[in-house]
Amino acid sequence: MNLKTGRVLKISGPLVVAEGMEEANIYDVVKVGEKRLIGEIIEMREDRASIQVYEETAGLAPGDPVITTGEPLSVELGPGLIEAMFDGIQRPLNAIKAKAGDFITRGVEVHSLDRDRKWHFTPVKKVGDTVEAGDVIGIVQETSIVEHKIMVPYGIKGTIETIEEGDFTVVDTVAKVKDKDKVSDLIMMQKWPVRRGRPYGRKLNPVEPMITGQRVIDTFFPVTKGGTACVPGPFGSGKTVVQHQLAKWADAQIVVYIGCGERGNEMTDVLNEFPELKDPKTGEPLMKRTVLIANTSNMPVAAREASIYTGITIGEYFRDMGYSVALMADSTSRWAEALREMSGRLEEMPGDEGYPAYLGSRAADFYERAGKVLSLGSEGREGALTVIGAVSPPGGDLSEPVTQATLRIVKVFWGLDSQLAYRRHFPAINWLNSYSLYLEKISPWMDENVASDWTALRTRAMSLLQEEANLEEIVRLVGIDALSEKDRLKLEVAKSLREDYLQQNAFHEVDTYASLEKQYKMLKLVLFFYDETQRALNAGIYLKELLDLEVRDKIARAKYISEESIENIDAIFNELSEVIDQLISKGGIMNA
């Protein structure tokens, strides 16, 4: 495609204005300067194009050439995505290291997917079959746990003329489809523009929870498969550890982790831990289902904006195969700051705190690409894309624009609290501020698949925690002695809920993950203790005697009982019941 070459007119940080670009279109990818830096046109005025450059612009000068590719910023989708680590514009970091060394050289050009590696393609359709966009024509065993489905690209339909099994690269023809007089060659790779959501049949109502193994999330503030959630919190409150825990243990089949403008060490942690950690369902390393996008704080600011879209497009691709995908974006605040930077350079009218007026609509465009869908194609596959975004409000101020724009869109809010973090209560999700709007949808599933009284237990536990907050106000004013024995018991049970149930150690090999069965038994145990001690109080037993029971230590240590020995929790129920019966039969101190 021979398009006219433009010239750089002015440079302002990551923004380059070029003239002579009348043949280009908005969102076209361009190559800027002699080093062919990658950029994207974000505004057109007559023949002048404002270009967001995704690499360091030092050394560019007015008059340097600007060449348009005539294509929008797109990602390559095909075998080779899983276990890979890309930068914000889908350049594989391993390939860059092999080509240019430890540091990313400006203007380096490498293919996103390896063109030399061969994959074994197994057809599932045969010659003569009629196919349409979205139909699976064959599979590639990409890793031991991910079966990569090769789909007919959007816009192609017809009858299969040739299809064969064998080892192919991602650009080799694996099948030919004929529609009337037109024959299309199908390869294992597709290209898709990142700013456009991938098409699907229709959206479905999400009713199944995404089980994360984190008790405070699964019990009180669950997110559905295909839902949206945000994790806002001040520095040091544990946002990244929450995101890592979700990436490790969420029951999604594919995880896309975007490190957007955060520290490089956090991506290093993921690279070190994930190959060693085993998926609880398959027993395979977690890395075998993970795609990493690393756009750390020391990389150019503009690429942060692209990294979010790159990640969600890859997520949509796996969703279209019928997989449940979880996408973690850490942190969307850095993405919003990149928007603010470019908006300022474009001299647009600033909105709240200097962010552009379109911050809310851009955030909505991103989160609305989540969902549970019926994929294109005749097979009717169901896939889900769950999006969880971390937000880093300066000083933990939840009234700032990025948090407010996010809260208007997402259905689940896990509010991290610095006070809880300072008390070493992790995950520091504040149970009084957080909410989940999926509870009504999820409750029937929980009652059916976990236990019939799950919703009732959850409601009781939450009301106890809320009563504790009210009673603490009274204690602060007049002291604990002003409370009745029953109210003091409520405080003790709420403390047990906080410390023995909600608190969870992400770095303990057993406590890092709790199955729904274990969560149910632990929650029921704490509330059973409340019921039994109330029975004892009514029979005239002193509260102090009940609080000194040795069985309380066993309740506190129930979180460290492994999934294989889960029946040991049932033994604590029996022991507690026997101890209370003995106390009542003895009559306690009051009746001695």
UniProtKB/Swiss-Prot annotation:
Q: Does the UniProt entry include the keyword Ion transport?
A: yes
Report the GO molecular function annotations: ATP binding; proton-transporting ATP synthase activity, rotational mechanism; proton-transporting ATPase activity, rotational mechanism
Instruction: Name the InterPro entries on file.
Output: ATP-synt_VA_C, ATP-synth_a_Xtn, ATP_synth_asu-like_sf, ATPase_a/bsu_AS, ATPase_F1/V1/A1_a/bsu_N, ATPase_F1/V1/A1_a/bsu_N_sf, ATPase_F1/V1/A1_a/bsu_nucl-bd, ATPase_F1/V1_b/a_C
Q: Where does ATP bind?
A: G233, P234, F235, G236, S237, G238, K239, T240
Cellular component per GO? proton-transporting ATP synthase complex
Look up the record and give one Gene Ontology term from the biological process aspect: proton motive force-driven plasma membrane ATP synthesis
Coiled coil regions, renumbered to chain: none
Name of a matching Pfam family: ATP-synt_ab_N
Q: Which UniProt keywords apply?
A: ATP synthesis, ATP-binding, Hydrogen ion transport, Ion transport, Nucleotide-binding, Translocase, Transport
* E.C. no: 7.1.2.2
The record's catalysed reaction(s) read: ATP + H2O + 4 H(+)(in) = ADP + phosphate + 5 H(+)(out)
> What family is reported?
Belongs to the ATPase alpha/beta chains family.
NCBIfam families referenced in this protein's UniProt entry, alphabetically: PRK04192.1
Biological role stated in the UniProt entry: Produces ATP from ADP in the presence of a proton gradient across the membrane. The V-type alpha chain is a catalytic subunit.
Q: What is this protein called?
A: V-type ATP synthase alpha chain
